[in-house]
Amino acid sequence: MLGSGFKAERLRVNLRLVINRLKLLEKKKTELAQKARKEIADYLAAGKDERARIRVEHIIREDYLVEAMEILELYCDLLLARFGLIQSMKELDSGLAESVSTLIWAAPRLQSEVAELKIVADQLCAKYSKGYGKLCRTNQIGTVNDRLMHKLSVEAPPKILVERYLIEIAKNYNVPYEPDSVVMAEAPPGVETDLIDVGFTDDVKKGGPGRGGGGGFTAPVGGPEGTVPMPMPMPMPSANTPFSYPLPKGPSDFNGLPMGTYQAFPIIHPPQIPATPPSYESVDDINADKNISSAQIVGPGPKPEASAKLPSRPADNYDNFVLPELPSVPDTLPTASAGASTSASEDIDFDDLSRRFEELKKKT
């Protein structure tokens, strides 16, 4: 049922604060773990194996804690992504049961590291009742993440895990170390898988960052760190082999229909180019005469009526071409027609015009 002290906005703000605080702690603890590995290598070089084993247990604890923080960060991000379900539904959604119960279970164990985690747990208990919170803290409800419970447990790490940490640290820092033969012989067969899950992840073996903040080893595999394997050269096609599609193995039936085989394309060669170009009667010696305009060469031929009037010319020799005689241009004006005046001076009488003009002036 809906709790009276639940405040959705306060839960949203503290979820974001928890995510930011967890990221900072993961980065800090990872850097400290890397420095501690160098200290353990110095212990091994000095022959202080027991001191090195104790320091390795501290590193394993820190690596477990970093992985647990990553799980809690994931669950907080999930609650923010589905925050609408928390606000709208009075009952707990089945897809959020593991996230909510795990955060409530981890709050009293990590509140010294992340104080905002306790506020988140209190808001979730106010939302889904205090009785539900009690069941989550004791894991009587059975939905708390098992891996997180293993990472935050108070049990000592297995001896085989400690030995493998020492082996990897000695290998990375080039320090001679002889592992305990009794511990290596008594290692159960199932521990190897747990070791790979804890520290030796697939990402670390490939040279990439491990899932944990500092739990994995970055031992180079397949070459020194930073080198990239060269790809195999691609086979080049032969120049003398003609192209053809690969033939199928044989006819097969698809939905009861027989399928035939594909035939390769025949080798098609281009036709041979003749040694001398062919001659054309209509364009022979077209460039012999430079006086012929391009319009006469390229343009369409004359009409039959016009071509009949043109003088004949030799077909093969343009040098003997003679233009037809044209009439000369007249240099005198044509004669006046009958009944018309011969000159412009005879048509106009200026004396008569002046006399008439004077008479008009007198009348006015």
Swiss-Prot record:
Superkingdom of the organism of origin: Eukaryota
Matches recorded under InterPro entries: Ist1, IST1-like
GO biological process annotation, one example: protein transport
Positions bearing Phosphotyrosine: Y43
Disulfide bonds: none
Sequence positions bearing Phosphoserine: S4
Principal location class: cytoplasm
Pfam families reported in the protein's UniProt record: Ist1
Gene Ontology cellular-component annotations: centrosome; cytoplasmic vesicle; midbody; nuclear envelope
Record's keyword terms, sorted: Cell cycle, Cell division, Cytoplasm, Cytoplasmic vesicle, Cytoskeleton, Nucleus, Phosphoprotein
Biased composition (Low complexity): 335-345
Span list, region Disordered: 294-352
Compartments where found: Cytoplasmic vesicle; Cytoplasm, Cytoskeleton, Microtubule organizing center, Centrosome; Midbody; Nucleus envelope
Protein family per UniProt: Belongs to the IST1 family.
Record's function text: ESCRT-III-like protein involved in cytokinesis, nuclear envelope reassembly and endosomal tubulation. Is required for efficient abscission during cytokinesis. Involved in recruiting VPS4A and/or VPS4B to the midbody of dividing cells. During late anaphase, involved in nuclear envelope reassembly and mitotic spindle disassembly together with the ESCRT-III complex: IST1 acts by mediating the recruitment of SPAST to the nuclear membrane, leading to microtubule severing. Recruited to the reforming nuclear envelope (NE) during anaphase by LEMD2.
Quaternary structure and partners: Interacts with CHMP1A, CHMP1B, VPS4A and VTA1. Interacts with SPAST, STAMBP, and USP8. May interact with VPS37B. May associate with the ESCRT-I complex. Interacts with MITD1, in competition with VSP4. Interacts with SPART (via MIT domain); leading to the recruitment of SPART to midbodies. Interacts with SPAST.
Name by which UniProt lists this protein: IST1 homolog
Originating species: Pongo abelii (Sumatran orangutan)
